[in-house]
Design a protein with these regions (language model features):
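Catalytic donor-sugar/metal-binding loop of nucleotide-sugar-dependent glycosyltransferases
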Residues: 241, 251-270
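Aromatic-glycine-rich donor-binding/catalytic loop that engages nucleotide-sugar donors
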Residues: 139, 205-221, 225-243, 256
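Short, flexible, basic/aromatic active-site loop/helix in glycosyltransferases
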Residues: 170, 174-182, 192-219
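Conserved donor-nucleotide/metal-binding helix-loop-beta segment in metal-dependent transferases, i.e.
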Residues: 152-181
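N-proximal low-complexity "stem/linker" segments adjacent to membrane-targeting elements
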Residues: 1-62
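Active-site-proximal specificity loops/subdomain of glycosyltransferases
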Residues: 20, 78-140
């Protein structure tokens, strides 16, 4: 049974009545008449040939409140794109497929580069960003919802609960982030459990109360990739192009929204998707790289807000983080014991030791370059630099889909 505790700086919308999808869907059908909903599905070709996608599409096909679906494909060859088009050809909802590796879209990326509003390199951030642009160019949806295509435990209730807070005009939220537990026979979500939350708590102890850190600490699953937002936010939000995507998006939401317009919603009893390796010896891949990118995003965002990091802060942060994370390991060990879950204390400790090294690398990079790679520009800047870009984007996607 879910709790009903309200903690932190944002509203928590709990799942107190599971199995209520039909009521939610009926209400969403009404809300969508005034606030049409677009669903964005960022995917690699391998996601669309893996086992979970069949169930995901089967569940999506049963809903009647979506106005449009945008599948934004990364790392996809020509013959693979043709296969994906065939997959969606008979789908019962309007589907546009953005082929990010195709000639038409690559030409647009080149134009952006020449005009000084680069969309950065290939990745989920750029794929999501171009999908938002296409939705804005069409101008037919007021709500944008995004989730991944590798969710093993997907069902219609997850989608409905994700859409509902922003689609419902009576609630008046502009941004909603999903949260959930990630449990099989053991606890998952190592980067959230053992890195991000302990890092935020360590920073709070060192630097003191910072509103931005209090805000981040309010999210129950800060790295969840599922969210909904008003389409207007897609015009003004910038997007990171690396593993700092989720935290970077939250930073932009913090910058552009009132806290009263931000919420998080419990979307599932449990959530399972593909797992990333820790990669403890290689900081350029896996959870190791993810932790470094996330830390840099947090440090750079704080610096941009005027936070001054004290002298000697790196050593203090590493020590404080390590102690905090070790305390978290003990808590999760107790959690696992009472619930009869497997718990490998050694592997949990290896993860934390890897993340400590990642913090040092992130701090070094931050001090060397406090700005980092520029974020992907917001769409207002793009259309200011290239007034007819939306028309070009619509034409490119439509040409690829014919």
């Amino acid at each position: 049974m879910a709790d009903f505790f309200q903690n932190g700086e944002i509203s928590n919308l709990h799942r107190l009545k599971p199995g209520d999808a039909k009521r939610l869907e009926k209400e969403l059908e009404g809300f969508s008449q005034k606030r049409p909903i677009a669903l964005v599905l960022p995917a690699l070709f391998q996601d669309l040939t893996a086992k979970p996608i069949k169930n995901i599409l089967s569940e999506i096909a049963k809903v009647n409140y979506l106005n449009e679906i945008v599948v934004t494909l990364g790392r996809t060859k020509k013959e693979e794109f043709a296969e994906v088009k065939a997959m969606f050809a008979s789908f019962n909802l309007p589907v546009a497929i953005i082929w990010n590796d195709g000639e038409n879209i690559r030409e647009l990326y080149s134009i952006l580069e020449k005009e000084g509003v680069s969309a950065g390199g290939d990745g989920k951030g750029r794929s999501a960003w171009i999908a938002y642009g296409y939705i804005l160019a069409r101008g037919k949806s007021d709500v944008i919802v995004l989730h991944d295509c590798d969710i093993v435990t997907y069902n219609r209730e997850l989608l409905a609960r994700l859409c509902y807070p922003v689609a419902n005009p009576n609630l008046d939220y502009e941004f909603c982030k999903g949260y959930y537990a990630r449990v099989t026979n053991r606890l998952h979500g190592r980067v959230t459990r053992l890195f991000v939350t302990p890092l935020i708590r360590a920073l709070k102890r060192i630097i003191g109360r910072i509103d931005f850190l209090e805000y981040l600490d309010s999210f129950r699953y800060i790295l969840a990739g599922e969210f909904s937002m008003r389409a207007d936010l897609a015009r003004i939000n910038r997007i990171p192009g690396d593993w700092g995507l989720e935290v970077g998006v939250l930073a932009e939401i913090y910058r552009n929204c009132s806290l009263r317009r931000i919420c998080q919603v419990d979307i599932a009893d449990n959530y399972e998707h593909k797992h990333q390796p820790l990669s403890e010896v290689d900081p350029n891949t896996g959870l190791n790289k993810m932790s470094i990118d996330i830390a840099k995003t947090i440090f750079r965002t704080m610096a941009g807000m005027g936070v001054i990091f004290p002298s000697g802060w790196v050593k203090t942060l590493k020590a404080t983080y390590l102690r905090t994370a070790q305390d978290f390991i003990a808590k999760y060990g107790h959690d696992s014991e009472i619930d009869g879950l497997a718990f490998d204390r050694h592997q949990e400790s290896v993860s934390v030791e890897t993340f400590v090294k990642g913090i040092e690398l992130a701090c070094d990079e931050f001090e060397r370059d406090p700005f980092g790679a520029p974020q992907i520009s917001n769409w207002n800047r793009v259309t200011s630099a290239i007034p007819n870009f939306f028309d070009r984007l619509k034409s490119a996607v439509e040409n690829d889909n014919t």
